[in-house]
Regions:
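Terminal intrinsically disordered/low-complexity segments used for targeting and assembly
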Residues: 1-35, 94, 118, 202-250, ...
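Short flexible linkers and secondary-structure junctions
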Residues: 1-138, 280-284, 303, 314-324
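Transmembrane beta-barrel architecture of outer-membrane proteins
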Residues: 26-28, 93-95, 141, 186, ...
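Sec/SRP-type N-terminal targeting helices
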Residues: 41-42, 58-59, 104-132, 182, ...
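Outer-membrane beta-barrel proteins
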Residues: 76-80, 181, 291-295
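Periplasmic alpha-helical coiled-coil/stalk elements that build and connect Gram-negative outer-membrane
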Residues: 110, 126-244, 355, 359, ...
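A short glycine-centered flexible hinge/capping loop motif at secondary-structure junctions
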Residues: 174-178, 384-388, 425, 429
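C-terminal structured "cap/appendage" subdomains that terminate the fold
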Residues: 377-416
């Protein structure tokens, strides 16, 4: 993994950063997670909700029109007329009409409310993109965990074979009187110690596979066919991002969401301020009355009413002014949240860059250490067989080799994982929208 060099961020590469690892299995898992992940589905539903709430706010710009109809029957005692006829006192009246009302947005309260709901929608859409960034990073990291643990298992199993041979050799030497029973028992103990680490690694491997299954919206255990075969850890590319323009970093979804929530809260100040001023409403109705339903259309009695109303708050004991102070305080809080989000983003990027650079140095040292440990282990066993050193030298060299090989496997995975964290810190993948998400994000 030597020869790394830094370059500035490329936005196109940032959008699909996981493809730089050139791993078809990882690409497949990413596609499955985008299509099936339950957290993404929840975020999509919240976008749909926010869009509907903006629609509710937008409806306030328009008049409200209602249709009504009613029928009434009244009766009274029978009356004897002067000509001797008896007339019953029952009467039927039917009514139908339309009522309309419209509150004029004189001082911008409705406009500010719509601006607030629009900004909230933008924040919710940014939250969805943030979910995507987190999901893609989590899927890639879990996948690297799988491959790293598989690599550690491979090292452990290979060392077990070597240690089994050492156990056999010490046994033969003991039978020939060239070694003691202590050597045999120490060899067996070293073998068993390595063997004891295997179940832990197998448990960690299953946990990583199950984590991937859940992230891709599947039941634990369902990815065995995809991940059962051991494959190498994806290698980080020779060129890695070392810098990112500030405008790219500001497009991180969490920063965008904080900025939109600040905008929404700023608009709420306008809503609260508008409540200090008069409100003007227009209203009207048209209707028709008849004694028979058939006459409502052709022979009814028509009526209409129009009106205008003006209301203005006179005394609210300072509640409206206090509400403005509340909204302004919330703006200050939202701005502080925005600033904190930006600072945290820069911190995350700097930490990711530092971790990657330091892991690169550690990895290079471990490569040299493993090479030396392998040579030392071979020499120790040769000298032991020649009677030049005691068995303790073999054990020490063997343990050193096992430790450094395992550390190198972990470093292989950590080097790629740190690159993933770096892309995640840049907000990589926020613009990825598969068909289902694209439909949810459409207006």
């Amino acid at each position: 993994m030597g020869g790394f060099k830094a370059e500035s961020v490329d936005q196109a590469a940032l959008a699909s950063w996981w493809t730089v690892l050139n791993d078809p299995t990882l690409n497949q898992l990413v596609e499955q997670s985008l299509a099936n992940n339950t957290t993404v589905k929840q975020a999509m539903a919240r976008v749909t909700e926010a869009r509907a709430r903006r629609g509710i706010a937008g409806a306030s710009f328009w008049p409200s029109i209602n249709a009504s109809t009613s029928g009434n029957r009244s009766s009274s005692d029978s009356v004897l007329t002067s000509d001797g006829q008896i007339v019953t006192g029952s009467r039927e009246i039917y009514q139908a009409g339309l009522d309309a009302s419209w509150e004029i947005d004189l001082f911008g309260g409705t406009r500010r409310a719509y601006e607030s709901s629009t900004a909230q929608l933008g924040a919710t859409e940014a939250d969805l993109r943030d979910v995507l960034v987190t999901l893609l990073g989590d899927v890639a990291l879990a996948y690297i965990d799988v491959r790293t643990t598989q690599s550690r298992l491979t090292f452990a199993e290979r060392n077990l074979e070597s240690q089994r041979e050492v156990v056999d050799i010490t046994g033969w030497r003991a039978e020939a009187g060239l070694a003691t029973s202590l050597d045999v028992e120490q060899a067996k103990s070293s073998y068993s110690q390595t063997l004891a680490a295997v179940p832990q690694l197998e448990s960690a491997l299953e946990a990583a596979k199950n984590r991937l299954a859940v992230l891709t919206g599947q039941t634990p255990g369902s990815l065995e066919g995809v991940l059962g075969e051991r494959k190498p850890i994806p290698v980080a590319p020779a060129e890695v991002i070392a810098s990112v323009p500030a405008e790219v970093l500001r497009r991180r979804p969490d920063i965008r969401a904080a900025e939109r929530r600040l905008a929404a809260q700023t608009a709420e100040v306008g809503v609260a301020t508008a409540q200090l001023y008069p409100s003007l409403s227009l209203s009207g109705s048209i209707g028709v009355n008849a004694t028979r339903t058939s006459d409502l259309i052709s022979d009814g009695l028509h009526s209409n009413r129009y009106g205008i109303s003006l209301s203005m708050p006179i005394f609210r004991a300072g509640a409206l002014l206090q509400n403005i102070r509340v909204q302004n305080a919330l703006v200050e809080s939202a701005f502080a949240t925005y600033e904190g989000t930006v600072l945290s983003a820069y911190e995350e990027v700097e930490n990711a860059l530092t971790s990657w650079a330091n892991e690169q140095k550690r990895h290079a040292a471990l490569v040299d250490s493993v090479e030396s440990a392998r040579i030392a282990s071979e020499l120790a066993l040769m000298q032991y067989n020649s009677g030049l050193v005691d068995f303790q030298v073999v054990l020490t060299a063997d343990r050193q080799l096992i430790s450094t090989e395992d550390a190198l496997a972990v470093s292989d995975g950590e080097l790629t994982s740190n690159l993933i964290r770096l892309y995640k810190a840049f907000g990589g993948g926020w613009s990825v929208f598969p068909p289902a998400i694209t439909q949810a994000a459409a207006p």
